[in-house]
Amino acid sequence: LTGRTPNRAGVYDWIPSGTKTHMKKNELTIPAMLKTAGYATCMSGKWHCNGFFNRKEQPQPGDFGFDHWFATQNNAAPSHENPRNFVRNGKEVGKLKGFSCRIVAQEAGKWIESHVKKNPDQPFFTFVAFHEPHEPISSPKSMIKNYPRAKKKGEALYYANVENMDYA
């Protein structure tokens, strides 16, 4: 988002939920720069830039230049399937049906379609960050069956997880 390594942006390790660690609000981000050039901006997916997600104590996606955002702090929970921890523009969404990668892609696609319809001449930027293939892995059973030569069940789950992103 900044074009810099995490260390240069003040993030030195992974960011567990409920910690003071976060990307500093004064970081210049690509969406913030594009907004100054007249772009509309959207973020959909994993927002792993703070420990206090969707709380005023730390900056949120909208503070970094996103007009529309649909995200989780870290992973889709309780798993990639039927997640319940998404937030849209500061409002909790509740339990969703389906796999996270497809939900994230659909949200971005709907935003793009709506934006182009309402503002056909305005350029836009969409940032999509899938949760997959991060653990805990959950994949469609129909895709797991595509990998009968996998040596372990975990391998088939992983391959199906990547395939599911391809179809998102």
PLM feature spans:
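Formylglycine-dependent sulfatase
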Residues: 1-168
